[in-house]
């Protein structure tokens, strides 16, 4: 039954699960990721957490269909409240906005020992996750950016460690926004994403610069100019 196929983004998340780990997948939807990880002997066991009835029942059905009831515990609850402290070696949260993932981590941080590996896949606004990890003194140990079905996704991997190590050679503000590992690698997906973002920011800047000359607009123009400068630096240098 290990023919379960994952999307490219979830496959990337799965690759970072430590071998033999007990994983907790928060917002597990159909529990594809924990089922795949256990079936392929990546994880020794898993917890699949879901808050709403539909996805919770879908996850239960998938675990049963995969014959994994003895290896995967499907639990209903909000965020990290589905796990006990120290119960999981790796925590995966995938397919949500960065602000929501950061909120889930903040709301459930009493469940974290600091020894877990966090594997986080935001659909947008990864900056919120990097800021949370830095605040809570987690070390970012790797990042991936990939494109699937015309959309860009990032995967962030963090563990306890030196929170500043990843940001060596890049300003903290730039690293938080675009990702320190991704900025060093600068692959085609990264350049496409941030070139488009720069063009979008320039377009907004031009629109506001033609609007009324208010203090609010002046402040906004300064923020946009700073952002454009930062993006140009990231795209053109290094």
Curated annotation (Swiss-Prot):
Keywords annotated in UniProt: Cytoplasm, Methyltransferase, Phosphoprotein, S-adenosyl-L-methionine, Transferase, tRNA processing
This protein's GO cellular component annotations are: cytoplasm
**Secreted in keyword set:** no
UniProt KW Acyltransferase keyword: no
GO molecular function annotation: tRNA (adenine(22)-N1)-methyltransferase activity
Question: How would you classify this enzyme at the top EC level?
Answer: transferase
Q: Where in the cell is it found?
A: Cytoplasm
One GO BP on record is:
tRNA processing
**Enzyme Commission number:** 2.1.1.217
Q: Which residues carry this modification: Phosphoserine?
A: 70
Q: Which reaction does it catalyse?
A: adenosine(22) in tRNA + S-adenosyl-L-methionine = N(1)-methyladenosine(22) in tRNA + S-adenosyl-L-homocysteine + H(+)
The record ties this protein, via PANTHER family, to: TRNA (ADENINE(22)-N(1))-METHYLTRANSFERASE
Q: What does this protein do?
A: Catalyzes the S-adenosyl-L-methionine-dependent formation of N(1)-methyladenine at position 22 (m1A22) in tRNA.
Please give the family membership noted in the entry. Belongs to the TrmK family.
Protein's name in the database: tRNA (adenine(22)-N(1))-methyltransferase
- The organism named in the record is Bacillus subtilis (strain 168)
Q: Specify the taxonomic lineage.
A: Bacteria, Bacillati, Bacillota, Bacilli, Bacillales
């Amino acid at each position: 039954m290990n023919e379960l196929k994952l999307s490219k983004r979830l496959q990337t998340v799965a690759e970072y699960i430590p071998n033999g780990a007990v994983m907790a997948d928060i917002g597990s939807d159909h529990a594809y990721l924990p089922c795949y990880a256990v079936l392929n002997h990546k994880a020794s066991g898993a917890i699949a957490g879901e808050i709403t009835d539909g996805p919770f029942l879908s996850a239960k059905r998938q675990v049963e269909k995969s014959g994994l009831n003895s290896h995967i515990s499907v639990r209903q609850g909000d965020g990290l409240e589905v796990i006990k402290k120290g119960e999981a070696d790796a925590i995966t949260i995938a397919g949500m906005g960065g602000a929501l993932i950061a909120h889930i981590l903040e709301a459930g941080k009493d469940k974290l020992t600091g020894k877990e590996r966090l594997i986080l896949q935001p659909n947008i606004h990864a900056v919120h996750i990097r800021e949370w990890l830095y605040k809570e003194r987690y070390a970012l140990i790797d990042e991936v950016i990939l494109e699937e079905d015309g959309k860009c996704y990032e995967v962030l991997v963090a563990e306890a460690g030196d929170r500043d190590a990843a940001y060596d050679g890049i300003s903290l503000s730039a690293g938080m926004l675009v990702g320190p590992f991704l900025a060093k690698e600068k692959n085609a997906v990264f350049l496409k994403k941030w070139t488009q973002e720069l063009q979008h920011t320039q377009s907004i800047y031009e629109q506001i610069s033609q609007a009324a000359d208010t203090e609010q607009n002046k402040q906004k123009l300064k923020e946009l100019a700073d952002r454009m400068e930062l993006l140009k630096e990231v795209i053109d240098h290094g």
